[in-house]
């Protein structure tokens, strides 16, 4: 899907292939925004190894990015009624799998919770609140509406032909500071991770829209 654009956008192509193969990607936002890198992965095929990497090398705040329709169907209320976060990140109430977990904190338990959320519907919920996974509401329109890691992760899942759901966690240095610049590049080389910027993803999507608008 969308392979006609891949040659022009090699980083997007590599990220899509990684998502399809169940491998993580490093997604960077704009320098004048958060200026941070998140490890992201498709929710439906995230591996135990990737989840352990997120818990070990990232902030520990494992987030499940979902499209607006899914958040509404699962009736996930906003974490607060008056969101005053600087970038308006769409946190909802936290979640946990209703069954099949122990403390909810381990890598396996968090994957179980994510799987339970993806299996849930308005009629049959397999999750409870509160919990140790933080759902995020991705705005309709993706990175063309909001240039956030939440939207970028869901956009990439869609482009990979997967469910519009992704997992992310902010990459950190061993000393507890945020990883940036060369620190991100070193980490990417160490683990052979594709690196993608939200700017590249936005340009890719804009090019798709332009091509779709061309007369047949």
From Swiss-Prot:
Mg(2+) 2 binds at residues 34, 149. Binds 2 divalent metal cations per subunit. Magnesium or manganese. GO terms for biological process: riboflavin biosynthetic process. GO terms for molecular function: 3,4-dihydroxy-2-butanone-4-phosphate synthase activity; magnesium ion binding; manganese ion binding. Keywords: Lyase, Magnesium, Manganese, Metal-binding, Riboflavin biosynthesis. Mg(2+) 1 binds at residue 34. GO terms for cellular component: cytosol. Its cofactor is Mg(2+); Mn(2+). It catalyses: D-ribulose 5-phosphate = (2S)-2-hydroxy-3-oxobutyl phosphate + formate + H(+). Pathway: Cofactor biosynthesis; riboflavin biosynthesis; 2-hydroxy-3-oxobutyl phosphate from D-ribulose 5-phosphate: step 1/1. D-ribulose 5-phosphate binds at residues 33-34, 38, 146-150, 170. The keyword Manganese applies. InterPro entries: DHBP_synth_RibB-like_a/b_dom, DHBP_synthase_RibB. It comes from the Bacteria. Coiled coil: none annotated. The record marks 132, 170 as: Essential for catalytic activity. It holds the Pfam family DHBP_synthase. NCBIfam families: ribB (TIGR00506). Catalyzes the conversion of D-ribulose 5-phosphate to formate and 3,4-dihydroxy-2-butanone 4-phosphate. Belongs to the DHBP synthase family. Homodimer. This is 3,4-dihydroxy-2-butanone 4-phosphate synthase. It comes from Pseudomonas putida (strain ATCC 47054 / DSM 6125 / CFBP 8728 / NCIMB 11950 / KT2440).
